[in-house]
Design a protein with these regions (language model features):
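N-terminal and secondary-structure boundary signal
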Residues: 1-174
Length: 174
């Protein structure tokens, strides 16, 4: 990662991307990693903002697609079909955004410091990734936007289960 840019004025997205070497994305398939929300929850990046990012990537001949992974708990995001339905409800469609929406539940086994993780196949196979994140806390990955977006959202359900299991409180009887 070359640079991290924080901004709040979405009208200045083009200017912000000028500070980021977006030309490196030209000619590449680019997963745009984001959380497309939960049912009845308004805290997720807005589709109109995401479309601006997709449009900027397309201007330089990148091939972007929206990307996320399924979750281990019950709900629409538990399956690819359910998550795609939820994405549509929240306005994340090819027609509205201008690119495909890909939900992954397959992983590539990856070992780091003697721990095995299943990294989402589309992320493991990518040379370039663009992340759009909202700030959120998580017991296993801490407070963060993009770090949490990849820490929990870039792995398979099985890896998520293992990470959550490791952070459960333990009751010790005296």
């Amino acid at each position: 990662m070359k640079k991290v840019i924080f901004f709040t004025d979405f009208k200045k997205l083009h200017e912000a991307l000028e500070h980021f070497d977006i030309q490196d994305f030209a000619g590449k398939k680019v997963p745009v990693k984001l959380h497309m929300g939960e049912l009845k929850n308004k805290y997720f990046p807005r589709p109109d903002f995401v479309k601006q990012v997709v449009d900027e990537l397309k201007k330089i001949n990148a091939d972007p697609y929206l990307f996320d992974t399924t979750v281990s708990y019950t709900g629409l995001r538990h399956s690819k079909t359910g998550y795609l339905k939820l994405a549509k409800i929240h306005g994340f469609t090819k027609k509205k955004i201008g690119c495909n929406v890909v939900i992954d539940d397959l992983g590539i086994p990856t070992t780091i410091e003697d721990r095995e993780y299943e990294v989402a196949e589309h992320l493991a196979d990518s040379t370039h990734i663009f992340a759009i994140s909202h700030v959120k806390g998580h017991v296993a990955t801490g407070m963060g936007g993009t770090i949490k977006n990849f820490g929990m959202g870039g792995v398979t359900k099985e890896t998520k289960r293992r990470m959550h299991h490791g952070s459960r409180p333990v009751y010790l009887k005296d």
